[in-house]
Amino acid sequence: MPRAGVCGCWGGQVLPLLLAYICYLLLGATIFQLLEKQAEAQSRDQFQLEKLRFLENYTCLDQQALEQFVQVILEAWVKGVNPKGNSTNPSNWDFGSSFFFAGTVVTTIGYGNLAPSTEAGQVFCVFYALMGIPLNVVFLNHLGTGLRAHLTTLDRWEDHPRHSQLLQVLGLALFLTLGTLVILIFPPMFFSHVEGWSFREGFYFAFITLSTIGFGDYVVGTDPSKHYIAVYRSLAAIWILLGLAWLAVVLSLGSLLLHRCSRLWQLIRGLDLKDGAAPDSEPRSQKIPISA
């Protein structure tokens, strides 16, 4: 019965997944509240105290004038202007910064620290995203497929069947290790050095960026007190694209690596039995295809 099939699907698959999803969200909300609410209250109290001290030191200002000034600062921040800077600071819309912004649009990262403020810019951003997001998905898919295709060379190691599984597992592990260093270790170290962050902050920025969460609390190339090279943010955009492609490969290879480790363990456990068998009756280890 079609109706019974739909009900069975909801009861057997969708409903448990929905409950797990809701529970996961509730768990995250509870932990974030416990970790962050007290710090937010302290920051709010500290800000109010600083405003009172400012009014005490500058008696020519009243509360209303200060609130208006704070509002101007907030509006400038929303439009991408850093209140700590001045008119001599580099533009947020030079080519390098614009290239970086375009990358955050098509990758759906959207840090939130910079957005079009003109009507024409907002309209263009909508149509640009409509075309750019699918293009980005197709590009990353093909780039990830190309990176993964290089691993198919492991299939040529067939001279020693007993070692083929080991070679394939080691090859995947080496690929994941080098990718982690190039994408998730070295770039945070570089960003930490340039931006004056700790490694924890640099790694946090890298993960939040490559996971396309993009909170906007840490963004490269936005400190007005630093002098960045012209291509700094453009290079960061290229790193984002390569990092997203690498993550796509990692997600697709993660289950494959676990499966091969399981096969390798079975192979090791069966070595004694295979050594006792006749040479011509020794089974060849079956290759697990890497490419889809």
Swiss-Prot record:
Write down the InterPro entries for this protein, in alphabetical order: 2pore_dom_K_chnl (IPR003280), 2pore_dom_K_chnl_TASK (IPR003092), K_chnl_dom (IPR013099)
Tissue expression, as annotated, is: Expressed in pacreatic beta-cells (at protein level). Expressed in pacreatic delta-cells (at protein level).
Where does the chain cross the membrane? 14-34, 120-140, 166-186, 238-258
Name under which the protein is recorded:
Potassium channel, subfamily K, member 16
Description of its domains = The pore-forming domains 1 and 2 assemble to form a single pore in which M2 and M4 transmembrane helices line the central cavity and M1 and M3 face the lipid bilayer. The transmembrane helices are bridged by the selectivity filters 1 and 2 carrying a signature sequence TxTTxGYGD that coordinate the permeant ions. Up to four ions can simultaneously occupy the selectivity filter and at least two elementary charges must translocate across the filter to convert it into the open conformation.
Residues that hold K(+) 4 according to the record = 108, 212
Q: Where does K(+) 1 bind?
A: 108-109, 212-213
Entry's family note: Belongs to the two pore domain potassium channel (TC 1.A.1.8) family.
Which Gene Ontology MF annotations are present? Answer: metal ion binding; potassium channel activity
GO CC, any one term: plasma membrane
- Give any single GO term for biological process: endoplasmic reticulum calcium ion homeostasis
Q: Which stretches of this protein does UniProt put in the Cytoplasmic compartment? A: 1-13, 141-165, 259-292
Pfam families the record matches: Ion_trans_2
The species this protein belongs to is Mus musculus
- List the catalysed reactions: K(+)(in) = K(+)(out); Rb(+)(in) = Rb(+)(out); Cs(+)(in) = Cs(+)(out)
Q: Which residues bind K(+) 3?
A: 110-111, 214-215
Q: What does this protein do?
A: K(+) channel that conducts voltage-dependent outward rectifying currents upon membrane depolarization. Voltage sensing is coupled to K(+) electrochemical gradient in an 'ion flux gating' mode where outward but not inward ion flow opens the gate. Homo- and heterodimerizes to form functional channels with distinct regulatory and gating properties. In pancreatic islets, conducts K(+) countercurrents for Ca(2+) release from the endoplasmic reticulum (ER) and regulates the frequency and duration of cytosolic Ca(2+) oscillations coupled to secretion of pancreatic hormones.
Query: Subunit info?
Result: Homodimer; disulfide-linked. Heterodimer with KCNK17 and KCNK5.
Which locations, inside or outside the cell, does it occupy? Answer: Cell membrane; Endoplasmic reticulum membrane; Mitochondrion inner membrane
Q: Where is this region: Selectivity filter 1?
A: 108-113
Q: Per UniProt, where does K(+) 2 bind?
A: 109-110, 213-214
What are the start and end residues of each intramembrane segment? Answer: 98-116, 202-221
